[in-house]
């Protein structure tokens, strides 16, 4: 009796970004037969010492992203501020990209996000698009509001609370969203997974507790304490957001 064992080559998986989330991705990837690659500007980033191969480079730079990805089987991200143009070309050349570049274009741009919500009737605060400070200065009647720069803002950057016209000096002289301020009882984050077949999975929602001076996350409470009917609403909205994206 002879048995034949065939070993398939390990899949080469790239991650754009080497921060804490990239490190957690690598910890999960350790359970699978994959070879991991990370692209990040900092040699001492949290993910640098857990991946099989580390490349120093700017995840927003076309050449850096394209050259990093052209020998890989699949690429994913730990942050949305990446060069989507390079990912589109890599996808056309056969590299699997998760999430798809077409989805990333919306995810990384708050203006496109708001228009996406509006198109698909997903609940969201009222908003106005401002292309520069001159346009922002005409919106005193819309206050109080939150000004969010269209692209590039994260971890407290690119967000300003505007209560009076004098606060317009803190606004952004770039394409941005001016979002009507709402009273927040709790801020909830809901993770959803979707595969090509359209199947979805929901993870327990978490409550986000922010430092309101720095607009930075202080703590997450998991699972969030929610009434059942509120949980159903959270899940329904999250599923609507994900299902309207084309796989």
Q: Each PLM stretch: what is its role?
A:
Residues 37, 76, 97-98, 125, ...:
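Structural detector of well-ordered beta-strand residues that form the stable sheet scaffold
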Residues 53-57, 93-95, 115-118, 145, ...:
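Short, hinge-like loop/turn segments at secondary-structure boundaries
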Residues 58-62, 84, 133, 165, ...:
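Structural motif corresponding to alpha-helix initiation and N-cap regions
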């Amino acid at each position: 009796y002879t048995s034949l064992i065939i070993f398939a080559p390990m899949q080469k998986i790239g991650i754009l970004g080497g921060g804490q989330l990239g490190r957690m991705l690598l910890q999960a990837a350790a359970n699978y037969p994959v070879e991991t690659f990370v692209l990040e500007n900092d040699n001492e980033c949290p993910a640098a010492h857990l991946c099989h191969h580390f490349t120093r480079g700017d995840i927003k730079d076309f050449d850096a992203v394209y050259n990093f990805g052209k020998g890989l089987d699949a690429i994913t991200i730990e942050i949305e501020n990446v060069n989507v143009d390079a990912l589109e070309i890599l996808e056309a050349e056969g590299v699997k990209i998760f999430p798809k570049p077409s989805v990333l274009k919306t995810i990384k741009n708050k203006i496109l996000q708001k228009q996406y919500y509006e198109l698909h009737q997903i609940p969201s605060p009222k908003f106005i698009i401002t292309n520069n400070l001159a346009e922002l200065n005409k919106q005193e009647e819309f206050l109080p509001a939150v000004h969010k720069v269209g692209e590039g803002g994260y971890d407290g950057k690119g967000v300003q609370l505007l209560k009076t016209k004098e606060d317009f000096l803190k606004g952004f002289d770039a394409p941005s969203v001016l979002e009507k301020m709402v009273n927040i009882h709790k801020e909830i984050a809901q993770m959803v997974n979707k595969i090509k077949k359209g199947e979805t999975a929901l993870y327990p929602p978490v409550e986000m507790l922010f430092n309101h001076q720095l607009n930075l996350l202080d703590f997450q409470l998991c699972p969030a304490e929610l009434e059942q009917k509120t949980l159903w609403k959270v899940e329904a909205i999250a599923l609507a957001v994900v299902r309207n994206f084309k796989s």
